[in-house]
């Protein structure tokens, strides 16, 4: 029986699915944060907020500090895309936000989660292309190393006053040793870009997975940010659309 009770504690009584962002009411019942938020939205029409299970009174504060407007001490209901702020009903009446576009918290989370996932898929494809370019540069470096050995052989022949016919027998397209550092630098640039892009993609995927009202502004800021300049140059070689994150 104890095991059954434990299993029930991991299920939201409203959606009957495993708890997501679990929050506890004043009476200690657990719900998905979004499920309880939607319940409170409906209950606020009547002005009576109560636990969906036992009907005991509960406050909006159980949703957490991030869901309460610190200016008016009321629950936030909308996300302003222009300012990146969470707004309560009183905030929405402010002239500051009259010309702004606001989304409901639920729609904003869904909207930004889709944008984050779409961008991470695009950048993961770019990451694969960068890794291919890095592999190509490595092959070129190996070829240059062989060429340098041949270059040294050519120099030895010159030092030994060999005939022009012997020199002409060697390919003249071989590069000098001074070209090697440039190729090594290219490989380091690609390695650095692959590392940066891997971290960026992982961050986008993690943010999309854990996105909630408290991180909507972070998601908006991240999507509006451009890649570092060095990364932009390398991404432009694999992505004609450009490296902006949004």
Curated annotation (Swiss-Prot):
It holds the Pfam family zf-C3HC4. One of its GO terms (cellular component) is IkappaB kinase complex. Disulfide bonds: none annotated. GO terms for molecular function: transferase activity; zinc ion binding. Residues 105-170 form a coiled coil. Belongs to the TRIM/RBCC family. This is E3 ubiquitin ligase TRIM40. It comes from Mus musculus. The lineage of its organism: Eukaryota, Metazoa, Chordata, Craniata, Vertebrata.
């Amino acid at each position: 029986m104890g095991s059954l009770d434990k299993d029930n504690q991991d299920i939201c009584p409203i959606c009957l699915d495993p708890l997501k962002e679990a929050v506890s009411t004043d009476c200690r019942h657990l719900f998905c944060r979004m499920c309880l938020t939607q319940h409170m939205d409906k209950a606020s029409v009547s002005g009576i907020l109560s636990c969906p299970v036992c009907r005991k009174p509960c406050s909006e504060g159980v949703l957490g500090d991030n869901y309460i407007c610190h200016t008016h001490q009321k629950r936030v209901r909308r996300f302003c895309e222009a300012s990146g702020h969470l707004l309560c009903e009183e905030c929405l009446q402010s002239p500051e936000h009259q010309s702004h576009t606001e989304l409901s918290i639920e729609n904003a989370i869904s909207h930004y989660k889709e944008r984050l996932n779409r961008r991470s898929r695009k950048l993961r494809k770019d990451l694969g292309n960068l890794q291919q370019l890095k592999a190509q540069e490595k092959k070129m470096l190996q070829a240059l190393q062989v060429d340098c050995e041949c270059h040294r052989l050519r120099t030895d022949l010159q030092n030994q006053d060999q005939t022009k016919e012997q020199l002409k027998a060697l390919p003249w397209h071989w590069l000098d040793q001074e070209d090697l550092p440039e190729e090594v630098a290219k490989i380091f640039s690609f390695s650095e870009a692959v590392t940066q892009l891997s971290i960026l993609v992982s961050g986008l995927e993690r943010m999309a997975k854990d996105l909630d009202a408290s991180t909507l502004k972070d998601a908006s800021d991240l999507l509006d940010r451009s890649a570092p300049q060095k990364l932009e140059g390398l991404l432009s070689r694999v992505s004609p659309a450009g490296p902006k994150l949004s």
